C-alpha cells in the first residue's frame, strides 16, 4: 500500500503531466511545450524532478524484496544491455536474423541491393545516452559510460537539455553546450539510448516520434533504443498501441528485439537495423489496418 509520502510525490508528478496535457489542448503541442519549458515554469519543473528522484528511490532501494526488484526499470535495462552487447552477444544473433531476412527479401525480388552497416566489436565501456535521466540512475553500472540529460536535472551529474531542440551533428565526439545547456550531440556515437518514462511526458504523438528519430541518428549501427513506459493494465490491454509503436519505429529503421511486461511498466528494446530499407520493408509487410506513423499513448484519447 502506498504511504502518504508516496501519494504526495505521485500527486506532484501527475499534476505536472496534467498541466502539460491541458496546455496542449488549449494551445497545441508546440506552444504548450514552449510554455512548459519556459523560465516561468521553472518552479514546477524543479518540484517534478525532486519528486521523481524520491519516488524512484522508494522502488530502487528495495533490492531485497523480489516483487519490488521485478519492478526495477533500472535493473531491467542494465541486465538487457549487458546481455545484448556482452554476456549473450544478442547483437550478433539479431544481425544474423536480419541478414537472413535481407536474403529472403532479395530472393523474392522485393528488395534490391542495399547498403548494410555493422557495428564493430563493442567497447569495454558502452557509450550510453540517458534522456530524461532526472538523477543519472545508470551511472552505477561500471561498463556504462553515461551521458545523462534532463529538462530539469535533479543532480549535478545530469546535463540540462531540451531534447526536442538538440541538434544531432556528425563529426563531433562530445556534447556541446551553450549557456549551460546541451545544444548539440554527436551523430552515430552511442551504443545505447535510453528513454525511461520519457515518451509519455511528451504532449503529442509527433513529438514522441521526433524523439525516436533523434535516437536513430544518435545510435551507432546495431545500437539499441531502450524504451520504458508506464503501463498498469494487463498485458493485452494496450497491445494495439504497442503494435503501432513497433510499426512506426520500424518505418524509421528501428526493429523491436525485446518486449516484456512488468508490474506497472512495459519494457521494450529497439535495434538500429543493419539497413533502414530492410526495416522499412519489414514494416510494410507487417502493417495492419489502422496503423500509422505515430507514437500514441492512452492519455491522447482522454
Curated annotation (Swiss-Prot):
One Pfam family linked to the record: Bmt2
SUPFAM superfamilies named among the record's database cross-references: S-adenosyl-L-methionine-dependent methyltransferases
Summary of the knockout phenotype: RNAi-mediated knockdown in the whole organism is embryonic lethal. RNAi-mediated tissue specific knockdown in neuronal tissue, glial cells, motor neurons or muscle cells is embryonic lethal. RNAi-mediated tissue specific knockdown in midgut is viable but results in reduced adult lifespan. RNAi-mediated tissue specific knockdown in eye imaginal discs is viable but results in age-dependent eye dysmorphia with loss of cilia. RNAi-mediated tissue specific knockdown in wing imaginal discs is viable but results in severely deformed wings.
List of residues binding S-adenosyl-L-methionine: 73, 132, 150-151, 162-163, 196
Keyword flag Electron transport: no
EC number in record: 2.1.1.-
Effect recorded for residue 197 to A: Abolished binding to S-adenosyl-L-homocysteine
Variant or mutagenesis effect after changing residue 163 to A: Abolished binding to S-adenosyl-L-homocysteine
Alphabetized InterPro entries for the sequence: Bmt2/SAMTOR (IPR021867), SAM-dependent_MTases_sf (IPR029063)
Assigned keywords, A-Z: Methyltransferase, S-adenosyl-L-methionine, Transferase
EC class: transferase
Binding site for S-adenosyl-L-homocysteine: 73, 132, 150, 162-163, 196
Molecular-function GO terms, alphabetical: amino acid sensor activity; methyltransferase activity; protein-containing complex binding; S-adenosyl-L-methionine binding
Family, per entry: Belongs to the BMT2/SAMTOR family.
PANTHER family (UniProt xref): S-ADENOSYLMETHIONINE SENSOR UPSTREAM OF MTORC1 (PTHR21008:SF0), S-ADENOSYLMETHIONINE SENSOR UPSTREAM OF MTORC1-RELATED (PTHR21008)
Protein role: S-adenosyl-L-methionine-binding protein. It is unclear whether this protein acts as a sensor of S-adenosyl-L-methionine to signal methionine sufficiency to mTORC1. Probably acts as a S-adenosyl-L-methionine-dependent methyltransferase.
Name the UniProt record assigns to this protein: S-adenosylmethionine sensor upstream of mTORC1
Source organism (scientific name): Drosophila melanogaster (Fruit fly)
Amino acid at each position: 500500500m502506498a504511504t502518504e509520502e508516496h501519494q504526495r510525490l505521485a500527486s506532484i508528478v501527475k499534476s505536472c503531466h496534467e498541466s502539460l496535457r491541458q496546455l496542449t489542448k488549449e494551445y497545441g503541442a508546440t506552444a504548450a511545450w514552449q510554455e512548459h519549458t519556459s523560465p516561468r515554469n521553472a518552479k514546477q519543473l524543479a518540484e517534478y524532478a525532486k519528486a521523481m528522484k524520491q519516488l524512484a528511490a522508494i522502488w530502487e532501494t528495495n533490492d531485497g524484496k523480489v516483487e519490488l526488484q521485478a519492478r526495477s526499470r533500472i535493473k531491467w535495462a542494465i541486465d538487457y544491455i549487458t546481455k545484448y552487447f556482452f554476456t549473450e552477444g544478442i547483437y550478433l544473433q539479431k544481425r544474423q536474423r536480419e541478414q537472413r531476412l535481407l536474403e529472403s527479401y532479395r530472393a523474392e525480388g522485393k528488395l534490391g541491393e542495399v547498403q548494410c552497416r555493422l557495428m564493430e566489436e563493442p567497447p569495454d565501456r558502452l557509450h550510453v545516452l540517458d534522456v530524461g535521466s532526472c538523477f543519472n540512475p545508470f551511472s552505477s553500472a561500471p561498463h556504462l559510460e553515461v551521458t545523462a540529460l534532463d529538462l530539469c536535472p535533479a543532480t549535478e551529474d545530469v546535463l540540462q537539455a531540451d531534447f526536442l531542440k538538440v541538434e544531432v551533428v556528425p563529426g563531433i565526439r562530445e556534447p556541446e553546450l551553450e549557456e549551460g545547456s546541451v545544444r548539440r550531440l554527436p551523430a552515430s556515437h552511442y551504443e545505447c539510448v535510453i528513454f525511461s518514462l520519457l515518451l509519455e511526458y511528451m504532449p503529442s504523438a509527433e513529438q514522441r516520434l521526433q524523439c525516436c528519430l533523434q535516437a536513430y541518428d544518435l545510435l551507432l549501427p546495431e545500437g539499441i533504443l531502450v524504451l520504458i513506459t508506464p503501463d498498469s493494465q494487463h498485458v493485452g490491454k494496450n497491445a494495439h498501441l504497442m503494435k503501432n509503436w513497433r510499426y512506426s519505429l520500424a518505418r524509421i529503421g528501428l526493429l523491436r528485439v525485446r518486449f516484456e511486461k512488468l508490474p506497472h511498466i512495459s519494457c521494450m528494446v529497439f535495434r538500429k537495423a543493419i539497413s533502414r530499407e530492410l526495416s522499412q520493408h519489414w514494416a510494410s509487410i507487417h502493417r495492419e489496418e489502422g496503423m500509422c506513423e505515430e507514437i500514441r499513448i492512452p492519455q491522447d484519447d482522454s
